[in-house]
Structures are given as C-alpha cells and as structure tokens.
Amino acid sequence: MKSLVLLLCLAQLWGCHSAPRGLGLIYRQPNCDDPETEEAALVAIDYINQNHPWGYKHTLNQIDEVKVWPRQPSGELFEIEIDTLETTCHVLDPTPVARCSVRQLKEHAVEGDCDFQLLKLDGKFSVVYAKCDSSPDSAEDVRKVCQDCPLLAPLNDTRVVHAAKAALAAFNAQNNGSNFQLEEISRAQLVPLPPSTYVEFTVSGTDCVAKEATEAAKCNLLAEKQYGFCKATLSEKLGGAEVAVTCTVFQTQPVTSQPQPEGANETVPTPVVDPDAPPSPPLGAPGLPPAGSPPDSHVLLAAPPGHQLHWAHYDLRHTFMGVVSLGSPSGEASHPRKTRTVVQPSVGAAAGPVVPPCPGRIRHFKV
C-alpha cells in the first residue's frame, strides 16, 4: 500500500514539472478565421508596424495556426502563426495599414512569416513574444506573371545610390521649405528598357533652408522630426540623365520624453546588411526578463544592422528576433508545445466534407 501511495505521489510530481509554468495542461484550437483569432492576429500586425523601424508596413494575409492556453491565475496565452504581405506604405507613413495597398506580384511582392504569443487579459491582447522573417518572391514566380517586370535591386547598388542622391537634389532644388537629407533607401529596381533606375527613399527635414543650403554637413535634423517619402526615376538619355521625383512630406512628430535603453540615442548608419551575416544581438543584455515587469514593456527590437552590403529589402528577422518581452506571462520563455493535450472546437454532425479549422482564408494572394 505504501508503495502505491509513493508511486501516485511521484506521478503527480512528474506531471507538475512537465507542464509549462503558469499555463494549464490543456490548450484549445479555435478556428483560424474566428473573430477572436483574427483580433489577435491584427494586434500582432499592429505590433509589427509600430516597431519595425525600416521599410514598409505589413498587412495580414493568412492565419496558419492558433493555440490558446489557459494561464494561471487568469487570462489566456494565444500562440499564433501568421503570413503577412508588404504594403506600399512606408513605416513612417501615418496612413492606417487598412488603407494601404498590398504590393502586387508583378511589383516583386514581399512575404513575411511570423510566430507570436499574445496574452489576453481582461479582454485585451498584449504581445509577449514575436519572431518574424520576410523574403521577396522568387524571380521565377515574378516572371510567371510578368516577363518584363524588373526585380528588386540591392539597396547599395551604385546606380541606386546615385539615383536617390540625384532625386533628393532635384527635390531640394524645387522645394521652398526646409532642406531634406537622405534618411533611408527603401526599395529599388533597375529597368532595362528604357534604361532607368527606379528608387523609393525616405528623407528627414533639417534646420537649413533648401534654397540656401550649400553644405549638408552643416545642417541639423529638426527637433520635431519631419519625414518624407519619395519615389523617383532616373532615366539614361543621350543628352544625359533625367530625374523625375515626387515626395510626400508627413506631419512633424513632436518630441516625447520617454526612458530609453542605454545606447538607444547613439547615431547609427543607414541599415543595409549582408543577408548571410549572423543577426545582430538585441538591445540590452541577453537572457530572460525579470518576473513582474510591466506588460507593455518589450525588448524585442534588434540593434540596427550597420554593414552596407548587398540587401534588397529590410528583413523582419533583424527586428523581431524571438526575444521574450518583459510582459511574458511567467517572466520566462514559455514552451507550450511540450504539452500535447488538445480540445478541438465542437463541430455538429453535418453532411459534406469537414473543413479543417486551420489554416485560415487567404486575404490577398499566396506568394
């Protein structure tokens, strides 16, 4: 009898250690197109667009999988996998992502893949973990829909850099306001016929007057940040190059005093990195955040890549590297995949094929 009691105690002890701390033993798998699942996915999309410092906003394309874990003493943890698509709105553009156009296949679309964990507490979602990567569509797939469409070019290609600088000079020459400096080359394509370079880039306003500025080095960025987004084409002609440029200047952004991590205000170069290089470490010391930290405090952002090497787009993996946020449910990295008990959503008996709950619908197109 004593042996039986001891065996039962050991079994209970093993069960306690095998479950993730702070999470229940049973998870549920709602439908990927349920309103609650989509709400969680849209919070994840907002998180990407609010924290990705370079390139373009992303929009939700498909929800691949979702698991919901009960969390002790309250709340639920949503583990969700989503596919995203790049839009034509830059991350500095204040336009809501719902009003941004998705970049089409013939324009050389970019797809993102993300794993998120979101804590739902008192009806509100907050991100506690984010890991993403993104990549342009293959050249073969672009050629299938448009044989002559140009592909993405490396952002530091000499022709691209020359086109961006020439376009900025042309914009400043016809601008009666502040002188603008080049902030980031965001996207570029080399067009074979007619020979031309298409480039998109961002600019930032300075305290110099455009018509009077002679040395950019003597100009300082405005205290209230003012950014603009430009599209330009530099065409090669017999008589020389011809530049066509249009810029949209966004409203100034007031300075807000917020606590910053150590080294956050240091000047960093325009991020263009080698895709084969290892990812930069995240800001702050590696390791797990302390328990009891504010749920809206995050340490997910990576240090900006600093090497100007061949790179055609700003990969999400350099920003969302899978570091646990300070708002993690237990203050540590959770691993809910260890527990395999699952509760499927109830489905009544009905004639016809059973539709799997996941993956969900494709909102735009598959890359």
UniProtKB/Swiss-Prot annotation:
Q: Which cysteines are joined by disulfide bonds?
A: 32-358, 89-100, 114-132, 146-149, 208-219, 230-247
The alphabetized list of GO BP terms reads: acute-phase response; negative regulation of bone mineralization; positive regulation of phagocytosis; regulation of inflammatory response
SUPFAM superfamilies recorded? Cystatin/monellin
Q: Which residues are glycosylated?
A: 156, 176, 265, 339
Q: Where does it localize? A: Secreted
Predominant subcellular localization, coarse grouping: secreted
What post-translational modification information does the record give?
Phosphorylated by FAM20C in the extracellular medium.
Q: Which positions does the record annotate as the modified residue Phosphothreonine? A: 319
GO MF, one term, reads: cysteine-type endopeptidase inhibitor activity
**Residue ranges under compositional bias (Pro residues)?**
276-293
Keyword terms: Disulfide bond, Glycoprotein, Mineral balance, Phosphoprotein, Repeat, Secreted, Signal
Q: Locate the Cystatin fetuin-A-type domain: which residues?
A: 27-133, 144-255
Q: Does the keyword Disulfide bond apply?
A: yes
Modification sites for Phosphoserine: 134-135, 138, 325, 328, 330
> Which InterPro entries does the record match to this protein?
Cystatin_dom, Cystatin_Fetuin_A, Cystatin_sf, Kininogen_Fetuin_HRG, Prot_inh_fetuin_CS
Subunit composition and interactions? Alpha-2-HS glycoprotein derives from this precursor, when the connecting peptide is cleaved off. The two chains A and B are held together by a single disulfide bond.
The task this protein performs is described as: Promotes endocytosis, possesses opsonic properties and influences the mineral phase of bone. Shows affinity for calcium and barium ions.
Family membership: Belongs to the fetuin family.
Please give the name of this protein: Alpha-2-HS-glycoprotein
Q: Which gene encodes it?
A: AHSG
